């Protein structure tokens, strides 16, 4: 029973735990009972209660067990119910896309996947029934929906709903001359380095020109930029030149200023002007303005008391903006904000477009579905375009932001016929390799070049680099384009993320971040002294150091005195202050004096004497007292007399104790030392640490005891440790002594009164990431990189990358790819274990080939084979068999086949018929590569007058075409714009004239809309005519009447003279008079044809009353209206050859330009038109010019006195404007304010011309404006004066003025234009702006203020002797003319001035605001072609110089007009004038209106017959603003008139 009950125990425990876990609320009640049961079970078997049986003990346990079994059964039932409930809930719903879905619900996560909720589980699968969900096919490969793949290393594509979307690399735009794509890269980079004067220079390097040491050049992004070295004026009398240097130097000495002495080379800031820095150079003080670093693009103005602008705000467009404040943006699609001196712009947010390829519409910011943007190109909606992808040709259409494409056949490359007969397609051979027509490739030996095959000629050009998105990119060796992986700053390369100090400005700390260097001024620590100092080359001021005993100590440092360690010193304000150290109190009363303090308790100082520890000595004043030294304390006691053995002791005078008459024996000592007396204490010689006593000749000794030392490191004295010094690590040190720690490196220890204290040596933080430790402190004079030390400027292999080469430079380590020698082959192989390519194999377009291996060309695998020869792939076409036909077409591999025909560059299918060669009038047919042709048969025409047009085979009937409407031969009609005129078509010629009325009745009636009076009723001569009938009313066969039915009322007669057709081109000898009963004359030969060559021309037919013009391949002849005459009919006559009658006064003069011209007098209107007065009428003739074709580097030009143009080299322009600013031929902007006469531009080689300007200060000192211009042409002198007055050889002339063949001067708008024979043009506005244009044939031959015109702006400051001058003022003064053409007057030389500084801050601010219009929308279209910044600076300069008032408006307009003139030259015409801004008044009463860029050759009465296109082509004058006639009117004698009232103009030949 006990065993069974024992077996129940584990079950009881298990059930109890289940019950307790299930019923948390009954734990407190059941747990004691269960514990009782367990404790009872585990208790000993004997009963502790007398008389209690085992049955009585187990009964409670069995009852509890039954209760637990019932509870467990109940728990199991509840558990089963819960599990069933969970299963039921799971089968009722699913978790869908972000929410629960009921049973049976269906949803689509994407366009090609469908999901269904079944039994609580989401079952998802593809939808193959949809066509676009079955995947994609690309280049013969199949891809599933959503699959991403890369057809090549630079393209990533994705299959989405049956459409393949591919995206190429995003390459930044480059700005260098040569670029290339490195192997394995997708984007081009700039080729590093520059070539200048026959030498190669590394990218970022700075160097002096070898031919001119006064030019400082730099190589940046493969371009060389040079600026003149500015030599400061030498402060000494005899400067010494140095070989190879530009500027002479003085011999060394110091400077004295007031009470201050400066050393040579020392710099300081002058008090009161923080921007002025002075320097002592060779005994002379030179001061200059501080150059502020450009820390941000738009810094705020300097704080009061400081010099340089700060980056805590922005100064933009003349306004101050705090950081974080919004600023205006020129791009309406961007929002800009000022951020710490920079302007950051973000595009405005755009809503998502409901189409896949939305496009951009001009004027809108966000893409919309009205167009398409596909593969980087914009297309209009419904526009169709073609693409070529991977050899396939696609035809695509844009529809509301969606692009759909379908494949089509690609056009066959045209082939040419060879001399031997078969047709061959052109190919290109470059460096022994053959390339097919139209293919593009990169030469392997020129990685930065892209080539293409065009018509059999290889065309190669440098790869253009995209602009990098950083300011200081680095161009790695071997790369074409710069990258932003590191920074090149001041010719040094820094790694990304590297902090460094600017080598040129040590007060700046810089940081390289993604190719852009951001610099900020070093924050100097606060100084505690009153007068901090700046040393040479020192950035931050610091307190002066102290010098004591020839040793230097920094400010604030505490240190022991070099010669007296008992003194502690400190450095303050450059002075060393010292005092005795504070001594610790001694732990004894009578210490010995130590090295510095009296606290040595190893002995006693008592009564003016020193005693060792333990010594007994008599009291200095009481001999009967005996004293003892005990660790610095003295104990004195009365002597105790020993008991005597004798009965009668004797007291000797001077002794304290009586003695027996027989004295005890002394104690002898070794050597010759004095014996020790009885009862005397002494120390044994050589053992000062033992104390002995002599007793009647016997010696007893005992060791002295030492007290504990009150310090940590006492030194050992003769017997006991002493705190007067230190014993540390086996070495003794004096108190106050400093020494290096023997245990810990770079720690310094101090011994003070027996204790040693060690602390780390203080070091300044290193300013580099890889410093080395020298003398315990980090130093940047070398590098500690990955545990290895390297010297500065040392190159070493990268321990982490075998193919990298690292350079240590001042504690910074920069690692780049190890440069490789260029391989001697074109397709080297890159082996993984080698850093550089090798020629022991070939790598050709991603395919590796062994030496001698032949394989198909990857670019043309079907038709070309390539062989690897010593690292270079040699590719050639497979040979083609000859074709057995005469006109084969290109087949596979461009081999000729006879399946179709190639004729005239086009392919024709077999059996196809086509037109023969142009002009052959043949019809051809293609049969198996053979072409047979037959001549066309023209159909017969029903008309007599036929014409065969050039380029056509068959003739056509010469009908008439007027205003786009065809009129048949012999027809007549009324023009819509002239109801009283009548036109007729006769033999292809249209003749129009006013209806000439004839009266057929006595009382004709004329209505308001009638052209001629009508006769009511259709009755004439007693006969009545029906509507539509016509008859001849009299004997004149030219008169005819027609009966016409009116809308209302009876019919009426309309009578007029017949209109005769114009006989254009009929010679007078061939004219036939009209026969009987005929009205019009005829011509015995064919009339003239209006061909394309004659379109726009005018001819005078035999009838002088008509003028004929060739339009739409049809002669249009109109009848001339004759003016009414005031003389009676009998005084009128018609001159032979003229149309209109004139009064019989052959001497009648003509009115021309406000003056009377005698009859018969002739004059020239311009170079192309001459006029004469004939009997009171002006007759003019105009010369016509042939079309002129100039080469690319030439432009049409006009010679003085010549009508027709000639080709001259393309010109360059130089301008002087404003106060005055000079923009040279090479584009440099100069400021020079001399008020004398100067050479502006001159032919310094051939002496062809010389242009001088005379400046005037207009009453303001230090500034000037151009007053007049003088042009010298050989012996002829022309002066262009104020108000557009012109003098030639001291005589005032009227414009236009011609002196053949040298000179022609004219007035266009408000601008005087001078044309001279060498191709020179001078434009003068009559106030202060002058422009000189010379052809490029004068390149490198000019001199003067306009520069030398050599294409290099940096050397424009050359004086007459050819030397570069340091300042613009000295340059301008060197070109002073000794005596001008005008009257002599006093003048002043130019000097360097800053009118804004003199005018003050308010004037500068107002000038900035007014000149800000240059950067606003009226000029925005010009900003891309002509940068506005130089003109903005010139405008501010001028407004400060002009001062307030009305003169400032003129100065502003001069600057704005100068910029607008440059814009017009670049092809952009800004519309910038307003009602209150630079208004130009025009004589409105004479019909003129202002035009910013009107036609330079306006329409006049003398050129109105010339077509507009021909007139514009032959007008080479510059576009100038001025007053023009509006459309529909022509200019004549200073008025705008209708063309109909112009005098007659007769056309002549060339």
Swiss-Prot record:
GO cellular component entries: extracellular space
Principal location class: secreted
Glycan attachment points: 340
Places the protein is found: Secreted
Recorded superkingdom: Eukaryota
Domain VWFD: 1212-1388
PANTHER family: CROSSVEINLESS 2 (PTHR46698:SF4)
Protein name as catalogued: Kielin/chordin-like protein
């Amino acid at each position: 029973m006990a065993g069974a009950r024992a077996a129940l125990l584990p079950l009881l425990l298990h059930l109890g735990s289940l019950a307790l876990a299930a019923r948390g609320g009954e734990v407190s009640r059941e747990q004691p009972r269960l514990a009782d049961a367990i404790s009872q079970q585990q208790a000993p078997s004997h009963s502790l209660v007398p008389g209690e049986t085992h049955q009585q003990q187990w009964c409670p346990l069995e009852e509890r067990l039954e209760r637990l079994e019932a509870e467990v059964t109940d728990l199991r039932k509840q558990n089963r119910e819960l599990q069933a409930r969970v299963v039921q809930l799971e089968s009722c719903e699913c978790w869908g896309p972000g929410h629960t879905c009921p049973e049976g619900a269906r949803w689509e996560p994407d366009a090609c996947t469908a999901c269904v909720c079944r039994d609580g589980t989401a079952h998802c699968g593809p939808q193959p029934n949809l066509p676009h969900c079955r995947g994609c096919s690309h280049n013969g490969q199949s891809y599933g929906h959503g699959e991403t793949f890369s057809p090549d290393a630079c393209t990533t594509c994705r299959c989405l709903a049956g459409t393949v979307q591919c995206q190429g690399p995003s390459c930044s735009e480059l700005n260098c001359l040569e670029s290339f794509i490195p192997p394995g890269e997708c984007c081009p980079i700039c080729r590093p380095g520059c070539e200048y004067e026959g030498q190669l220079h590394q990218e970022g390097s700075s160097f002096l020109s070898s031919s001119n040491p006064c030019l400082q050049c730099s190589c940046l992004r493969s371009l060389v930029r040079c600026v003149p070295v500015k030599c400061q004026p030498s402060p000494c009398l005899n400067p010494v030149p140095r070989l190879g240097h530009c500027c002479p130097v003085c011999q060394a000495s110091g400077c004295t200023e007031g009470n201050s002495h400066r050393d040579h080379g020392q710099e300081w800031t002058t008090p009161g002007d923080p921007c002025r820095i002075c320097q002592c150079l060779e005994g002379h003080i030179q001061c200059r303005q501080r150059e502020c670093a450009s820390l941000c693009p738009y810094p705020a103005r300097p704080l009061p008391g400081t010099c340089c602008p700060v980056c805590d705000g922005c100064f933009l467009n003349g306004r101050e903006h705090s950081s974080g404040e919004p600023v205006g943006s020129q791009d309406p699609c961007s929002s800009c904000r000022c951020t710490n001196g920079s302007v950051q712009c973000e595009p405005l947010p755009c809503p998502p477009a409901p189409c896949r390829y939305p496009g951009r519409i001009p004027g809108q910011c966000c893409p919309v579905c009205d167009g398409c943007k596909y593969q980087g190109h914009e297309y209009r909606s419904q526009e169709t375009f073609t693409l070529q992808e991977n050899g396939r040709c696609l035809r695509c259409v844009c529809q509301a932001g969606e692009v759909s494409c379908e494949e089509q056949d690609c056009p066959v490359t045209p082939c040419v016929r060879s001399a031997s007969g078969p047709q061959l397609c052109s190919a290109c051979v470059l460096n022994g390799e053959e390339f097919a027509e139209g293919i593009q490739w990169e030469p392997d030996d020129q990685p930065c070049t892209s080539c293409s095959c065009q018509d059999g000629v290889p065309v190669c050009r440098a790869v253009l680099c995209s602009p990098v998105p950083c300011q200081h990119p680095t161009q790695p060796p071997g790369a074409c384009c710069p990258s932003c992986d590191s920074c090149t700053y001041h010719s040094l390369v820094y790694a990304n993320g590297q902090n460094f100090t600017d080598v040129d400005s040590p007060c700046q700390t810089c940081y390289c971040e993604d190719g852009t260097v951001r610099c900020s001024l070093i924050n100097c620590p606060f100084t505690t002294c009153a007068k901090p100092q700046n040393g040479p080359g020192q950035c931050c001021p610091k307190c002066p150091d102290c010098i004591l005993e020839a040793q230097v100590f920094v400010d604030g440092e505490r240190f022991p005195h070099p010669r007296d360690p008992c003194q502690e010193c400190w450095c303050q304000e450059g002075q060393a202050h010292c005092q005795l150290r504070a001594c610790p109190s001694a732990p004894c009363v009578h210490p010995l004096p130590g090295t510095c303090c009296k606290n040595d308790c190893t002995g006693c100082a008592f009564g003016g004497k020193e005693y060792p520890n333990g010594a007994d000595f008599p009291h200095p004043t009481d001999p009967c007292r005996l004293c003892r030294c005990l660790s610095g304390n003295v104990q004195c006691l009365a002597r105790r007399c020993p008991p005597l053995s004798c009965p009668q002791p004797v007291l000797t005078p001077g002794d304290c104790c009586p003695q027996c008459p027989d004295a005890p024996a002394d104690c002898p000592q070794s050597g010759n030392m004095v014996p020790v007396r009885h009862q005397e204490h002494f120390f044994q010689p050589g053992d000062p640490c033992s104390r002995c006593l002599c007793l009647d000749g016997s010696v007893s000794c005992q060791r002295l005891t030492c007290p504990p030392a009150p310090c940590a490191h006492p030194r050992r004295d003769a017997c006991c440790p002493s705190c007067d010094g230190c014993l540390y690590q086996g070495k003794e040190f004096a108190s106050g002594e400093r020494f290096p720690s023997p245990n810990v490196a770079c720690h310094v220890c101090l011994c003070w009164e027996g204790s040693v204290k060690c602390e780390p040596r203080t070091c300044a933080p290193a300013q580099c990431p890889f410093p080395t430790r020298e003398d315990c402190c980090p130093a940047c004079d070398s590098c500690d990189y990955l545990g290895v030390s390297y010297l500065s400027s040392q190159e070493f292999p990268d321990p982490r990358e075998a193919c990298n080469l690292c350079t240590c430079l001042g504690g910074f380590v920069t690692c780049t790819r190890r440069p490789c020698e260029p391989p001697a082959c074109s397709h080297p192989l890159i082996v993984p274990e080698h850093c550089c390519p090798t020629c022991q194999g070939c790598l050709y377009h991603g395919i590796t080939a062994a030496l001698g291996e032949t394989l198909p060309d990857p670019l043309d695998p079907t038709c070309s084979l390539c062989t690897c020869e010593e690292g270079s792939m040699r590719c050639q076409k497979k040979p083609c068999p000859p074709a057995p036909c005469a006109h084969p077409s290109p087949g596979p591999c461009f081999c000729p086949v006879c399946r179709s025909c190639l004729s005239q560059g086009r392919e024709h299918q077999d059996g196809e018929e086509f037109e023969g060669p142009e002009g052959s009038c043949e019809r051809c047919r293609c049969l198996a590569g053979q072409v047979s042709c037959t001549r066309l048969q023209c159909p017969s025409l029903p008309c007599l007058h036929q014409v065969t047009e050039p380029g056509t085979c068959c003739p056509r009937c010469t009908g008439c075409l007027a205003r786009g409407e065809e009129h048949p031969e012999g027809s007549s009609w009324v023009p819509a714009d002239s109801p009283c005129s009548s036109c007729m078509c006769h033999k292809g010629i249209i003749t129009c004239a006013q209806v000439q009325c004839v009266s057929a009745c006595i009382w004709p009636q004329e209505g308001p809309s009638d052209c001629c009076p009508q006769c009511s009723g259709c009755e004439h001569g007693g006969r009545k005519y029906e509507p539509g009938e016509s008859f001849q009313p009299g004997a004149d066969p030219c008169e005819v009447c027609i009966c016409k039915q009116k809308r209302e009322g009876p019919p009426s007669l309309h009578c007029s003279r017949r209109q005769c057709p114009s006989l254009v081109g009929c010679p007078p000898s061939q004219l036939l008079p009209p026969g009987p009963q005929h009205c019009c004359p005829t011509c015995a030969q064919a009339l003239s044809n209006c061909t394309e060559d004659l379109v726009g021309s005018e001819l005078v037919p035999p009838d002088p009353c008509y003028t004929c013009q060739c339009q739409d391949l049809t002669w249009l002849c109109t009848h001339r209206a004759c003016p009414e005459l005031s003389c009676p009919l009998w005084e009128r006559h018609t001159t032979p050859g003229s149309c209109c009658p004139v009064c019989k006064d052959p001497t009648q003069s003509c009115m021309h330009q406000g003056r009377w011209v005698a009859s018969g007098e002739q004059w020239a209107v311009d170079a192309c038109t001459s006029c004469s007065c004939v009997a009171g009428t002006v007759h003019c003739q105009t010369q016509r010019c042939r079309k002129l074709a100039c080469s690319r580097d030439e432009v049409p030009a006009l010679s003085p006195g010549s009508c027709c143009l000639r080709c001259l080299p393309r010109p360059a322009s130089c301008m002087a404007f404003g106060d005055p600013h000079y923009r040279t031929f090479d584009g440099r902007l100069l400021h020079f304010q001399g008020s004398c006469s100067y050479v502006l531009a001159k032919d310094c080689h051939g002496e062809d011309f010389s242009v001088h300007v005379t400046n005037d200060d207009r009453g303001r000192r230090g500034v000037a404006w151009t007053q007049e211009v003088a042009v010298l042409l050989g012996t002829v002198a022309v002066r262009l004066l104020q108000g557009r007055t012109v003098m030639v050889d001291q005589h005032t002339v009227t414009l236009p003025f011609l002196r053949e063949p040298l000179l022609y001067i004219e007035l266009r708008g408000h601008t005087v234009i001078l044309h001279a024979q060498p191709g020179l043009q001078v434009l003068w506005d009559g106030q202060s702006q002058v422009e000189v244009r010379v052809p490029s044939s004068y390149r490198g031959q000019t001199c003067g203020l306009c520069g030398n015109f050599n294409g290099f702006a940096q050397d424009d400051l050359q004086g007459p002797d050819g030397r570069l001058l340091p300042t613009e003022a000295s340059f301008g003064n060197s070109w002073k003319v000794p005596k001008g053409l005008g009257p002599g007057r006093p003048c002043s030389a130019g000097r360097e001035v800053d009118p804004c500084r003199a005018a003050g801050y308010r004037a500068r601010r107002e000038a900035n605001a007014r000149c800000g219009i240059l950067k606003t929308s009226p000029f925005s279209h010009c900003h891309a072609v002509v940068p506005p910044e130089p003109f903005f600076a010139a405008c501010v300069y001028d407004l400060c110089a002009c001062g307030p008032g009305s003169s400032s408006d003129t100065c502003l307009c001069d600057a704005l007009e100068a910029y607008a003139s440059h814009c017009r030259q670049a092809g952009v015409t800004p519309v910038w004038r307003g009602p209150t801004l630079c208004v130009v008044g025009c004589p409105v009463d004479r019909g003129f209106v202002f035009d910013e860029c009107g036609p330079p050759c306006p329409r006049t009465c003398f050129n109105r017959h010339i077509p507009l296109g021909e007139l514009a082509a032959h007008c080479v004058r510059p576009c100038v603003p001025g007053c023009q006639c509006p459309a529909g009117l022509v200019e004549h004698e200073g008025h705008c008139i209708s063309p109909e009232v112009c005098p007659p103009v007769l056309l002549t030949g060339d």
